């Protein structure tokens, strides 16, 4: 005879068998499907640009695309991280790592100039149109092609609102992030970040940059020193092109300033106002892209398209003059003179930075200061008594040598980067 314990075990087994028949087969068994295996290959919110997006891009007027402030958002992001991140930023911090103006490694280039991409579904219609416009300009002026990603593309760009404006440089491998967050969706910012992805660092990081610009270390925040490194000439090429003040890859003169004073000053004084102000590719930008990817395009600039008004090629609008052409910058349009506060007698500006602050001339908070330092530019002078040019500007802070920082010799890391 079976004891009570055995009977209890049999009863439990019978209950389990009975319950198993009551459970639906979909819950009793679960198998991995083809969809489960493919899911990790896709981003949850990823989409691609549609034909409607490209149609909207064509409708964007040149004035609308170009009516934007200078692209200072890139060089004034929080935490001094700059707009180069990912493997490129990590490599630049290694002991043996160096930055390069244009990548020379075949591995870093996108095969045949084909760049698979997806974008975040968070972008609205206007933002997608700006992205599509940037893609169109690459397609029409270079052999670079941004194409929707397929399941066969392991290396691709994911463009999303991640954290500010940044990109890796060249083809990094796998899912490669390019962030164009709120505030970054401007045409010039988009082509700048995409040019990083194509394979280019900043123009002011060229190895020969000290022949063309001066770094004012006294005005740079310590945490941003590595944003002013130099590229390694032995491992890269400038593709036979001169230093390009007009490049869309150049930072502005106030980049990473800790005190509002200039950090980058051009050796040619009139170029200080030019650097970092590009709203489109320069002719040299396009030449370097086409040379890097062996595009079936001319390797020289068509001189017939150069006039006194600058580059007249196709695309977004007027092009900047060639760097070799020394054209004076046009003076800012004079503001209406206010008779009630007009300054009688000899009148002039007391600083060479007034052109940057013209929007503050009639500000309630800044009017008194602007009247004191920028009377001529702000239109506070009586026209008959105004002098024709500004008074001697307040001198900039002294320039330090390449191996010096604002507080003496720079650490080895910064000496290595320039």
Curated annotation (Swiss-Prot):
Q: Please list the residue ranges annotated as the ShKT domain.
A: 347-381
- What does the activity regulation annotation say? Inhibited by ethylene glycol-bis(2-aminoethylether)-N,N,N,N-tetraacetic acid (EGTA), ethylenediaminetetraacetic acid (EDTA) and o-phenanthroline.
E.C. code: 3.4.24.21
What catalytic activity does the UniProt entry give for this protein? Hydrolysis of peptide bonds in substrates containing five or more amino acids, preferentially with Ala in P1', and Pro in P2'
Q: Name one Pfam family in it.
A: Astacin
Active site residues according to the UniProt entry: 193
Q: How is the cofactor bound?
A: Binds 1 zinc ion per subunit.
What role does this protein play? Metalloprotease.
Query: Per the UniProt entry, how does temperature affect activity?
Result: Optimum temperature is 37 degrees Celsius.
Which pH dependence is annotated?
Optimum pH is 7.5.
Listed cofactors: Zn(2+)
Q: Where in the cell is it found?
A: Secreted
Q: Which residues form the Peptidase M12A domain?
A: 101-296
Gene3D superfamilies xref list: 1.10.10.1940, Collagenase (Catalytic Domain)
GO cellular component terms, A-Z: extracellular region
In its UniProt entry, what is this protein called? Answer: Zinc metalloproteinase nas-8
Asked whether the UniProt record includes Repeat among its keywords, one would answer: no
Q: Does the keyword Repressor apply?
A: no
Q: Which CDD domains match?
A: ZnMc_astacin_like
**Chain residues that bind Zn(2+):** 192, 196, 202
The GO biological-process annotations, alphabetized, read as:
proteolysis
Cysteine pairs forming cystine bridges in this chain are 143-295, 165-184, 347-381, 354-374, 361-378
One GO MF term attached to the UniProt entry: zinc ion binding
Protein's organism: Steinernema carpocapsae (Entomopathogenic nematode)
Q: Which residues form the propeptide?
A: 29-100
- Keywords from the UniProt entry: Cleavage on pair of basic residues, Disulfide bond, Hydrolase, Metal-binding, Metalloprotease, Protease, Secreted, Signal, Zinc, Zymogen
The UniProt entry, under PANTHER family, shows: DISCOIDIN, CUB, EGF, LAMININ , AND ZINC METALLOPROTEASE DOMAIN CONTAINING, ZINC METALLOPROTEINASE NAS-8
């Amino acid at each position: 005879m079976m004891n009570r314990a055995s009977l209890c075990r049999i009863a439990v087994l019978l209950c389990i068998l009975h319950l198993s028949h009551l459970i639906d087969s979909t819950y009793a068994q679960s198998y991995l499907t083809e969809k489960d295996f493919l899911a990790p290959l896709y981003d949850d919110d990823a989409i691609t640009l549609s034909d409607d997006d490209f149609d909207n891009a064509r409708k964007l007027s040149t004035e609308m695309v170009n009516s934007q402030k200078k692209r200072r958002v890139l060089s004034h992001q929080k935490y001094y991280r700059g707009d180069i991140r990912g493997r490129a930023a990590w490599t630049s911090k290694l002991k043996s790592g160096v930055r390069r103006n244009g990548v020379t490694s075949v591995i870093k280039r996108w095969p045949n100039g084909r760049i698979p991409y997806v974008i975040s579904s968070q972008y609205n219609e206007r933002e997608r149109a700006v992205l599509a416009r940037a893609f169109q300009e690459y397609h029409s002026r270079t052999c670079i092609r941004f194409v929707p990603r397929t399941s066969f593309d392991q290396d691709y760009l994911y463009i999303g609102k991640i954290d500010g404006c940044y990109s890796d440089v060249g083809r990094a491998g796998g899912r490669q992030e390019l962030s164009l967050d709120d505030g970054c969706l401007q045409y010039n910012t988009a082509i700048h970040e995409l040019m990083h992805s194509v394979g280019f660092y900043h123009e002011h990081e060229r190895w020969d940059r000290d022949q063309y610009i001066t770094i004012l270390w006294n005005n740079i925040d310590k945490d941003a020193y590595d944003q002013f490194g130099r590229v390694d000439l032995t491992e890269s090429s400038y593709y036979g092109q001169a230093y390009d003040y007009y490049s869309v890859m150049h930072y502005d003169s106030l980049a990473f300033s800790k005190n509002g004073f200039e950090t980058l000053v051009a050796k040619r004084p009139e170029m200080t106002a030019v650097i970092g102000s590009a709203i489109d590719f320069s002719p040299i930008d396009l030449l370097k892209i086409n040379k890097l990817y062996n595009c079936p395009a001319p390797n020289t600039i068509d001189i017939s398209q150069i006039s006194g008004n600058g580059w007249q090629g196709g695309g977004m609008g007027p092009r900047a003059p060639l760097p070799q052409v020394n054209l004076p910058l046009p003076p800012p349009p004079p503001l209406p003179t206010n008779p009630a506060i007009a300054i009688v007698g000899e009148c002039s500006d007391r600083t060479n930075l007034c052109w940057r602050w013209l929007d503050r001339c009639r500000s309630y908070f800044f009017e008194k200061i602007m009247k004191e330092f920028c009377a001529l530019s702000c239109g506070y002078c009586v026209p008959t008594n105004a002098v024709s040019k500004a008074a001697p500007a307040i001198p900039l802070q002294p320039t330090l040598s390449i191996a010096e920082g604002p507080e003496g010799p720079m650490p080895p890391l910064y000496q290595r980067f320039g």
